[in-house]
Every structure is written in C-alpha cells, then in structure tokens.
Amino acid sequence: MKIAIYPGSFNPFHKGHLNILKKAILLFDKVYVVVSKNVNKSLDPDLQSRVENIKNLIKDFSNVEIIINENKLTTTIAKELNACFIIRGLRSQADFEYEIKYYDGFKSLDPNIEVVYFISDYDKRSLSSTILREIEFYKK
C-alpha cells in the first residue's frame, strides 16, 4: 500500500491545496493531510477549526484522512503512519528554491523518505494562504 502525508499549516486550506491533494490521491492508496502549527506565524488559529474546514472540502475522498500535528517532526509522523512519501506543492521557481531546503531537511532526518512534488494548475498558482488571510483581515 502506498501511503503519503500532505503536511502544512493550511491556514486556510484553499483551492490550491485541494488541487495538489486531488493529484496526490490519483497516485497513493492513502493520503493523510497533516495539519500543523506554524511556529513562524503568529496568530495561528485553532488547529481544530482548520481541520473542520478541510473536512468539509474533502468529504467525498475515501482515501484521505486528516490528523493534527501538535509538535512532531514531519518525518516522525510519516514513520508512525508507515508513510514513505511526503507530498509538497509547487507554484513557482521561488517555491522550488524554498522546497529544496525542505527536501534536504527531510532526507537528513530520514534518508528513506521520498518527497513528491506536484505542480499547481495554472489557475491555482496565485493562491496563497498568507494573501487570503490578509484579504480577510482588511475586509473587516
């Protein structure tokens, strides 16, 4: 069974994330969406509310499960779930440069883990959780 994890803060989980997840479920038997705190972001909302948001968007996906990561390394969670793959999304060359560091980090922690990158569809590339949060903030 091919098991993967799709980690992120998903604050919020948006159409770009969903686009990557839909691609991943075509290749993997089981995908765990791992919702994590982001230590680099202040005002990180409640993890449970983010999980509920994702549940509403993926209710028709039979091979996807959502879990909360309070404070574990991504590679530790992968091992606990018997996942050999970590899913990441790419929107641009800048994302690629950023992701190389993650790749190196994942491989240094677990040389057996494979990181699989999916490129966002063209119409989803401009989506960013940070931008969506800023828009929501200024709408108030």
From Swiss-Prot:
Molecular function per GO: ATP binding; pantetheine-phosphate adenylyltransferase activity
Reaction catalyzed: (R)-4'-phosphopantetheine + ATP + H(+) = 3'-dephospho-CoA + diphosphate
Site (Transition state stabilizer): 17
Keyword annotations from UniProtKB, A to Z: ATP-binding, Coenzyme A biosynthesis, Cytoplasm, Magnesium, Nucleotide-binding, Nucleotidyltransferase, Transferase
Cofactor(s) needed by this chain: Mg(2+)
PANTHER family: PHOSPHOPANTETHEINE ADENYLYLTRANSFERASE
Family label: Belongs to the bacterial CoaD family.
Subunit annotation: Homohexamer.
The protein, known as: Phosphopantetheine adenylyltransferase
Species of origin: Mycoplasma capricolum subsp. capricolum (strain California kid / ATCC 27343 / NCTC 10154)
